[in-house]
Amino acid sequence: MLNRQQIQSYADHGYLVIEKLFDSEQVNRSLAAIDELLDPNNPDKPYEYEPQDGETVRRIWSPTQKHAAFKEMAADPHLLDCIEALIGENVLFHYSKLNMKGPKVGSVVEWHQDFSYYPHTNTDLVTALIFLDDASVTNGCLRVVPGSHRRGLVSHEVDGFFRGKAQGTDESLAVDIEVPAGSVLFLHCLTLHASACNTSQLPRRTFLPAYRAADAFPIYFGSHAAHNESGIQLLRGRRAKIARVDAGAYLLPIAEREFGSLYEVQEGSHLRKALASMETAGYAVTEPTAS
């Protein structure tokens, strides 16, 4: 369980690092599970490739639904104790993914707030980034802007359309999250974060289960909302009968064209790719409004 100082640090800075929350045995089991999912003989290929070579996998979708190792890790009691301390006693599993930066590849992830992709009635949403390799500047560790969650949701639009990247981030304020394997970064849904490409000879693989308070409900439209909700699972406490609503207005993630991932919408490849070649995520699409 987190102490008061750690909880306050998360509230103040929008993130919290707990080193080596998972031991080497748990980490190695997860790495072995990745190898199983990437086995060429595996008929299910729930992943996305790096565009540079078309062979290196940069993301595995919904690993908790694909392998028991990740389902168990996402429900680890020590991990959930931390989540409960940060967002309250009623905890829902939201979604999961595996982000992987291959050696000498590893796509850039531009500055963004996770909440921009899935606005909810309140902001008690947190992602646990579980590092399965040592994370360093050279292999593209995560970077965060401390306290940026206090700014609220910023625009992630380009030319009137959602592009999943925040404009005008002051990178001089950023902190590099360099941690050993088994460590966890708890990230507030409004904290600005990014990562560079991997310039090292070593991979950087990260498992990301996301959680939300039971009284936080999605407010965006499009089939993506319904798609995510089908995987929601109550992990602690009880389901909510009411939606807790923060005051304010949120810009909805309405894109120019359908896309399958953060990578595609940030790099703009969704504007060029055939829809059949993307596992589209169901985000709403509309014409830009007149200015």
PLM feature spans:
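Phosphate/oxyanion-binding loops and surfaces in catalytic or ligand/nucleic-acid-binding neighborhoods
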Residues: 36-40, 89, 135, 151, ...
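Non-heme Fe(II)/2-oxoglutarate
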Residues: 40, 44, 191-192, 196-291
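Glycine-rich phosphate/pyrophosphate-binding beta-alpha loops
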Residues: 114-116, 125, 189, 194-198
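Short, conserved beta-strand element in jelly-roll/cupin
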Residues: 86, 119-137, 178-179, 186, ...
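Non-heme Fe(II)-dependent double-stranded beta-helix
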Residues: 1-13, 18-111, 116-120
